[in-house]
């Protein structure tokens, strides 16, 4: 298993769960120190630092992971980036930065992994419930995840001999996803979302990591069953 975006949050939790279940895992992200800490914590695995948005890095990461693991059954793209900003305030650089991580990186990682995935291999991508919710001040994130969803559909048509899984993810904590967001802007956004009836419940990140590892293991073990979409959300209060 190759987890791209494994330095923290859902990616790190997924890698820990895979390792705890006896799976072989390679972890990738830009922060090499975090990857080394994760591998030491797991007591197994391979750290393969790299920038998923760079084509050469994406290819090198997939090649090194496949060599270390003896092939790839599964690549999971968990890396994600979002900003809280009204559309009227969003400049071209912000749009470019969010698209680069959430769409370009995901597609480069899939393309790089494709040569190493067997006929029943899986490329899985963490998408978002916000695609359906249209959260105010979160348009760049939800728009890029919608673009990713469309790419997943096209991957399926272009490579029907492989499997491409969309993982619809609800709110998860604790992660570092919102660390760069201003607290007052986050509070404003949460209030707006609540007013629109958008669910605000949170899932525990380690619970999500374990559940995702289990769901993907089932998909790998049963290739004849359609597992094209996996959905996780917090139970309503």
Could you describe each region identified by the protein language model?
Residues 122-147, 152-160, 171-173:
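Catalytic loop of short-chain dehydrogenase/reductase
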Residues 166-168, 186-237:
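C-terminal helical subdomain
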Residues 7-8:
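Conserved glycine-rich cofactor-binding loop
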Residues 78-83:
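Conserved NAD(P)H cofactor-binding loop of Rossmann-fold oxidoreductase domains
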């Amino acid at each position: 298993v190759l987890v791209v975006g494994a330095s923290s949050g859902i990616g790190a939790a997924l890698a820990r769960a895979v390792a705890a279940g006896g799976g072989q895992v390679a972890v990738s992200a830009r922060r090499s120190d975090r990857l080394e800490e994760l591998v030491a914590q797991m007591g197994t695995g391979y750290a393969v630092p790299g920038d998923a948005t760079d084509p050469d890095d994406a290819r090198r990461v997939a090649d090194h992971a496949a060599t270390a693991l003896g092939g790839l059954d599964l690549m999971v793209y968990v890396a994600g980036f979002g900003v809280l900003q009204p559309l009227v305030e969003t400049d071209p650089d912000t749009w470019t930065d969010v698209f680069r991580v959430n769409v370009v990186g995901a597609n480069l990682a899939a393309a790089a992994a494709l040569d190493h995935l067997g006929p029943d291999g899986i490329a899985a991508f963490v998408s978002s419930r916000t695609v359906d919710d249209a959260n105010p001040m979160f348009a760049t994130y939800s728009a890029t995840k919608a673009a990713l969803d469309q790419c997943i559909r096209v991957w399926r048509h272009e490579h029907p001999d492989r499997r491409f899984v969309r993982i619809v993810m609800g709110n998860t904590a604790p992660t570092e996803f919102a660390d760069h967001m201003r607290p007052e802007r986050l509070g404003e956004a949460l209030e707006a979302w609540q007013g629109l009836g958008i669910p605000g419940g949170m899932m525990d990140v380690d619970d999500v990591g374990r559940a995702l590892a289990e769901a993907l293991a089932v998909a790998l073990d049963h290739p004849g069953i359609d597992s094209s979409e996996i959905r996780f959300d917090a139970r309503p209060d």
